Amino acid sequence: MIFVCGIHGVGKTHFCRKLAEKTGRMVFSASSLIRRKVENDFKEKQVDSIQDTQTVLLNELRKITLQTPDYILDGHLCLLDNKNKIHRIDMKFIKQMSISLIILLVDSPAKIKKNLKERDGLEWSENFIEQFQNSEIKYAKEISKKLDVNLQILLSQQSEEVKFGESILLPIKPQYAEKILCGEKRYEYRTRLCNKNIDQIYLYSTHPVRAVVG
């Protein structure tokens, strides 16, 4: 799952739409998934019980993963409570989301303020927006390091520059297939591939075909 995050008003919806066109993946919004189960007013971008809503979100994501494991989630790493205090999503929830890539969108506080005013009628100060965005950036870096997940931080207006590796299909000699597919033997591919930006490698047994793994 590709997790696209960033504070409110940074342009995640537009970016996710473009990303879906590029990758062929479906897009889901964290807040929309939560609304399916919880009647909550997100107008002010505040959440009363962050832990409860994240539990709901995880349950909805599990259902999606059963149908389509490769998708895009539009969400946040930090949220506001009903007193406008910034809270991190608990790491235990993030860990269960099975994220393969984090894309964090950022922009200038002035631009985000303008977007929020025009779109939602919200009046957030630039200082508050900067604080909120810095919290999201700091936490994204911590998550990337602790969970060993790739992180790309992009300026919203440069978001078309996001790079994805190609997927390649490689053969396994029959005598090595079982050991490689069960993890007893490492698969070493040709050195010429090392210069490529590879996102996923799929292996298959040349004869007979026993399994394909990603």
Predicted features along the sequence, with ranges:
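Walker A (P-loop) phosphate-binding loop of P-loop NTPases
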Residues: G9
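Conserved lysine of the Walker
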Residues: K12
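ATP-dependent NMP and nucleoside kinases share a basic, alpha-helical "lid"
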Residues: H76-R119
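Small-molecule kinase domains that catalyze NTP-dependent phosphoryl transfer to phosphate-bearing small molecules
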Residues: E118, L122-V162
